[in-house]
Amino acid sequence: MKTEKININNIPAMVWGEKKSKVFIAVHGNMSNKEDKVIQILAEKAANEGYQVLSFDLPEHGERKNDTTYLCKVQNCVKDLKQIMEYAKENYNYKEINLWACSMGAYFSLLAYKDENIKRSLFLSPVVAMKVIIDNMMLWSNTSEEELREKQEIKTDFGTTLYWDYYEFVKNNPITNWNKETYILYGSKDNMQEEKLIKDFCNKFNCKLSVLENGEHFFHTDEQLEFYKNWLDIIK
């Protein structure tokens, strides 16, 4: 498949496939990158159906992994997602823009693209309630909201750093609007987001949910990837 590496306002990105009038913007998840296996599979399927794919590295991921001056915080990620969208509109003149997002990439997309004209959204193992995840990490690390506000950042024993500005942004920007045709693939053994939260999100925003029994948050086994490939048949 034809691929082209480009740079969008210092964001490393990749265009997959020949020039088309339709595109999927692909937003990867934590500890992933713009060339991840699930994005490769998406690009192959999308190309066969007449779409290009535009993927990019989130802060501190992929080609940006060693840049510690611009952290993978929600504010920065939302800013980057908006820049990618504007670039796609201005430079490629797509007639149709679609979205694929995984894990925390889905959460950033819900914030950045809520007012965008997106034809269809595909979410793999999405994070739809980031506050719940941060609240849990604060509980596990015995960190109170007051302590985090006072110290601004706290490094936990399990390796994650909690940031007050990140938490405050999440609290002040709840997901209240997502009026797009959306399909979600979720593993029943996802340890990042409870199934009830996913189902509540689907009911609230009329999303179509597919569940892989015994599937994990990280789709990586042959069985999981085969199920994922078949799920992508919704791309037409």
Annotate each language-model stretch with its function:
Residues M31-A43, K196:
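The serine-hydrolase catalytic nucleophile loop
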Residues C72, Y107, N117-D200, K204-V211, ...:
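The alpha/beta-hydrolase serine catalytic core
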Residues G62-Y92:
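Catalytic nucleophile-loop/oxyanion-hole region of alpha/beta-hydrolase
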Residues N30, D57-R64, V127, G215:
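Short beta-to-alpha linker loops that shape the active-site pocket of alpha/beta-hydrolase fold enzymes
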Residues M1-K19:
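N-terminal cap/lid segment of alpha/beta-hydrolase-fold proteins
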Residues W100-S109:
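Gly/Ala-rich beta-loop-alpha elbow adjacent to hydrolase catalytic centers
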Residues V38-I39, A43-N66:
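Conserved alpha/beta-hydrolase
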Residues S21-G29:
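Short beta-strand element of the alpha/beta-hydrolase
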